[in-house]
């Protein structure tokens, strides 16, 4: 089973994303900030890191950088309203990540996750 770790500080958004991905057959573990997600990544492997960029305690770009140091094969997708931040980022993991700009429909999220994991 494909394992997704989700980091999103908005409780409602995190719940919507988690339910949509679980309904699509994915195992999802979610956290409200990058720091907690990073601690979990250190404990067990995941197939995909799905993360917001702007979060408390550790932003999504830093989370992606640290997570890719632990697992260079980890696929990364940013969900954000701040796509320009990614375009100007000098972190290699962020440059190779897929970006899904908010707002988006949940079916678009599932389709993009499927496409990324199939690559």
Regions found by a protein language model. Give the residues of each.
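Acidic catalytic/metal-coordinating carboxylates
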Residues: 33-36, 59-63
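Active-site residues of response regulator receiver
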Residues: 52, 80
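Short hydrophobic/Thr-rich beta-strand motif most characteristic of the beta2 strand and flanking loop
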Residues: 25-32, 40
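Conserved acidic carboxylate
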Residues: 8
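Charged docking surfaces used in two-component/phosphorelay signaling
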Residues: 15-23
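Alpha4 helix (beta4-alpha4-beta5 surface) of REC/receiver domains from two-component response regulators
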Residues: 62, 82-101, 107-114
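Receiver (REC) domain active-site loop signature in two-component systems and cognate sites
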Residues: 55
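Hydrophobic alpha-helical motif in two-component signaling modules
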Residues: 38-41, 50, 64
């Amino acid at each position: 089973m494909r394992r997704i770790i989700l980091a999103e500080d908005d409780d409602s958004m995190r719940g919507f994303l988690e339910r949509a991905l679980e309904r699509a057959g994915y195992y999802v573990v979610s956290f409200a900030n990058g720091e907690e997600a990073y601690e979990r990544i250190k404990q067990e492997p995941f197939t995909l890191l799905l993360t917001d960029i702007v979060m408390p305690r550790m932003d999504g770009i830093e989370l992606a950088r640290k997570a890719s140091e632990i697992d260079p094969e980890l696929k990364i997708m940013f969900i954000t309203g701040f796509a320009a931040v990614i375009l100007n980022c000098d972190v290699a993991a962020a440059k190779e990540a897929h970006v899904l700009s908010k707002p988006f429909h949940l079916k678009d999220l599932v389709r993009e996750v499927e496409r990324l994991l199939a690559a």
